[in-house]
A protein has these predicted regions:
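N-terminal, charge-rich interaction modules
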Residues: 1-21
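Feature captures the catalytic cores and cofactor-binding loops of soluble hydro-lyases/lyases
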Residues: 22-23, 27-46, 50-117
Length: 117
């Protein structure tokens, strides 16, 4: 599924990385524990999180995450956005909760990081 479609499903507003809206995404994961993200997430996946710290971006960069969507209208600082822009990492904000975000994407056919539906 294209990143653009995912953002539409989540009613998300892009913050940066608009050039990557045609990115094809196969899997999605949700976590507020960055140690879990580092423990073997799928390259190019979408990360749903409620954390907005700069550590989220650093972790996403190391793990090869394709895009980060902040849930519950959580807005990162300009410093966080600038770091993501420097690595061409798309960021977006969704008004949906983590639960609703996961449910919507599952309903639309997205698979989890383990490939299960």
């Amino acid at each position: 599924m294209k990143l653009k479609t995912i953002l539409e499903i989540l009613e998300a507003t892009p913050l940066c990385g608009n050039r990557s809206l045609d990115l094809e995404v196969q899997t999605v994961g949700a976590s507020d524990l960055m140690s879990e993200v580092l423990a073997g997430w799928s390259y190019g996946c979408i990360l749903l999180t409620g954390l907005t710290s700069i550590q989220v971006i650093r972790t996403a960069m190391v793990a090869g995450v394709g895009a980060v969507v902040f849930v519950r209208n959580k807005r990162p600082t300009d410093e966080v956005i600038e770091l993501a822009e420097s690595d061409n990492l798309p960021l977006a904000i969704s008004p949906c909760s983590m639960f609703v975000s996961c449910g919507r994407l599952h309903h639309m056919g997205m698979t989890g990081l383990d490939g299960n539906r």
